[in-house]
């Protein structure tokens, strides 16, 4: 092979190495949520990258195979080519062969590390989604051609991993833990990227999975209920007005003559019934009062109460006894902070 062809082949191998390194780091670094957003904007290559990421072990094996083969061939072709180039271009034919080969190898290694490794790696890390969308489509063509070799190496690697007790992964885990996210929020506050109100709101949102209904439940002794006027009938207008005047709340649990909860009333349900304090409210107006265990996470309680469209719920102990009450507003306030308005609760 003449010198020019050998040099061009060496540069081509460095380019191939850079291609595989860039594709590998782009696949690892690209965030699925950003790719999904790009896919929703109609970027077909984003969908291609997402699908490639779902076969991550095969993709990485293919990249490593490509890097290895390119590096071996570069060593085989590049070093002799540089030796000949130095001899012809710079008149170094009189230099001892050992020194000339050492110098040529150093030049090839430097070009390989800089252009074939570091530059493509940093380009991929600087813009992983953009780089992945550019490199992955042609990379998949190579993967299809090299699939038999990739499958053999991938299966061997997985077998070795299982032998040492490591479970192979088919997809990159990009999730962060609650603790890591809390640290990120704290750092954002200290750096001025978040104000104190935003920091508090985000912190509350993170801890909702660890907060239970018992943490926000109102004890029975603090509940202002209205009692039915007689068995089989509802409370009176006067009873509801008195409760409203005392608390300013808009919803009141209803109890029977024995003190058992039978539902709750919203103040708007009785506005059309007149202003006679002795008027008895029909039990049909009383809304159902669901029950939630005190050990239920607040996030689940929020979902349950929203699903059944109830603003109040009885809180029960493990034995089923009623120990308190929780309002939907209490759950929301634990998430976003206290809210005050003219119809609090």
Swiss-Prot record:
The chain crosses the membrane at residues 3-23, 95-115, 312-332. The keyword Repeat applies. Pfam families: CBS, CNNM. The keyword Transmembrane applies. Disulfide bonds: none annotated. It comes from the Bacteria. Residues 217-280, 285-342 form the CBS domain. GO terms for cellular component: plasma membrane. Residues 1-198 form the CNNM transmembrane domain. It is a multi-pass membrane protein. Belongs to the TerC family. This is Uncharacterized protein MT1889.
């Amino acid at each position: 092979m003449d010198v020019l062809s050998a040099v061009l082949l060496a540069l081509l191998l460095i380019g191939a190495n850079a291609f595989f390194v860039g594709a590998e780091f782009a696949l690892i670094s690209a965030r699925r949520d950003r790719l999904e957003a790009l896919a929703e904007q109609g970027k077909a290559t984003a969908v291609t990258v997402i699908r490639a990421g779902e076969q991550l072990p095969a993709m990485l094996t293919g990249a490593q195979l490509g890097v290895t083969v390119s590096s071996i061939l570069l060593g085989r072709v590049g070093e002799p080519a540089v030796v000949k180039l130095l001899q012809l271009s710079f008149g170094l034919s009189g230099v001892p062969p050992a020194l000339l080969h050492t110098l040529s190898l150093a030049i090839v290694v430097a070009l390989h590390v800089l252009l074939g490794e570091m530059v493509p790696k940093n380009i991929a890390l600087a813009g992983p989604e953009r780089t992945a969308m550019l490199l992955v489509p042609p990379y998949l063509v190579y993967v299809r051609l090299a699939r038999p070799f990739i499958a053999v190496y991938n299966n061997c690697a997985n077998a070795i991993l299982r032998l040492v007790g490591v479970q192979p992964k088919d997809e990159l885990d990009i999730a962060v833990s609650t603790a890591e996210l809390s640290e990120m929020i704290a750092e954002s506050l200290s750096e001025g990227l978040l104000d104190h109100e935003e920091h508090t709101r985000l912190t509350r949102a993170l801890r909702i999975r660890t907060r239970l209904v018992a943490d926000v439940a109102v004890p029975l002794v603090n509940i202002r209920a209205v009692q039915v006027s007689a068995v089989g009938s509802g409370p009176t207008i006067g009873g509801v007005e008195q409760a409203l005047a005392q608390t300013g709340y808009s919803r009141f649990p209803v109890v029977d003559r024995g003190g058992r909860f039978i539902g709750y009333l919203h103040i708007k349900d009785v506005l059309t019934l007149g202003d006679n304090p002795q008027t008895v409210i029909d039990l049909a107006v009383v809304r159902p009062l669901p029950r939630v265990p005190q050990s239920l996470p607040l996030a689940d309680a929020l979902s349950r109460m929203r699903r059944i469209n109830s603003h109040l719920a009885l809180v029960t102990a493990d034995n089923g006894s009623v120990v308190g009450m929780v309002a939907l507003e209490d759950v929301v306030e634990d998430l976003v902070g206290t809210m005050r308005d003219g119809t609090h609760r």
